[in-house]
C-alpha cells in the first residue's frame, strides 16, 4: 500500500515536477495478476487497479491489518469500473459478470471479493475507488445503459464531452462515494473547462483510452497558483478540495472521476472564470 499524506496548498505551490508527482500522481495503476493500492489521507480514499490474467486476484487480510480492521471492506464501500475485457467479480460467493465499461458497487461488510478475467488474451482491467462507509447498501451492477448521461460543452471550445454518472444518487445509493466516466467527443481536447473547485469534496481522475504518443496536461492547484502534471495512459491523479482539476490532451481521451467527502450533490462546486486563472 502506497500511503500519500495530505498537503497544504501553500506547500504544494513550492514543489517541482518530481515533487508534484510524489504527492499527486498515481503512475502505475495496473500490474498483471496483482492489485495496486494508493491510500490518501485526503478523505481516506483508496485508489487502484486490478488486472487478473493467469489467476484470480483478491485483496487479502494484510490490507485489513493496515487499515486497522479484520478485512478490507469491514468499514468501507467499493466502486469498480472495468475498462478492459470481460471479467467477473465474486462477492461473498455471488458472481457478477462485468463486461467492458460495466461497473459494480460493493457495499460495506463484504468479506471476500475475488476478481477474474474471462479471456486471458483480453484481460479485465478493474479500476476502483474505495471510501469509508457508515452503513451497508446492496451490492449492485451498473451497465452503461443504466447510467445517467449528460452531454456538455461545444466543438467550438473543444470541450464537448459526455459525463456518464455511474454511482450517483439518481442511479444507486452509496454512503459517500460518487463515480463516473467522462468521454470526450472526437476532436475535442479539454475537460472541465471552465474549471471549478469543491471545498466539500476531494476527487481523483483516472485517464485512459489514450494512444502511446498522446498525453494530457492535467491542471491543478489553487486558481491563482496553477500547476500541471503530464498524464499518460492509465494513470491517476489526486485532487485535493482546494485544487482545480482540468485537463487538455494532445488527442481525445476518456477519464473516470471519483469523489468522496461531505455530500453527493454533483453541482456543489465553486466555479472559476477562465479570466481569473493564473
Curated annotation (Swiss-Prot):
Cofactor, how bound (note): Binds 1 zinc ion per subunit.
Cofactor entry: Zn(2+)
Listed InterPro entries: KduI, KduI/IolB_isomerase, KduI_N, RmlC-like_jellyroll, RmlC_Cupin_sf
Annotated S-S bridges: none
Pathway of action: Glycan metabolism; pectin degradation; 2-dehydro-3-deoxy-D-gluconate from pectin: step 4/5
GO BP field: D-galacturonate catabolic process; D-glucuronate catabolic process; pectin catabolic process
Enzyme class: isomerase
CDD domains per record: cupin_KduI_C, cupin_KduI_N
Function: Catalyzes the isomerization of 5-dehydro-4-deoxy-D-glucuronate to 3-deoxy-D-glycero-2,5-hexodiulosonate.
Listed name of the protein: 4-deoxy-L-threo-5-hexosulose-uronate ketol-isomerase
Species annotation: Shigella boydii serotype 4 (strain Sb227)
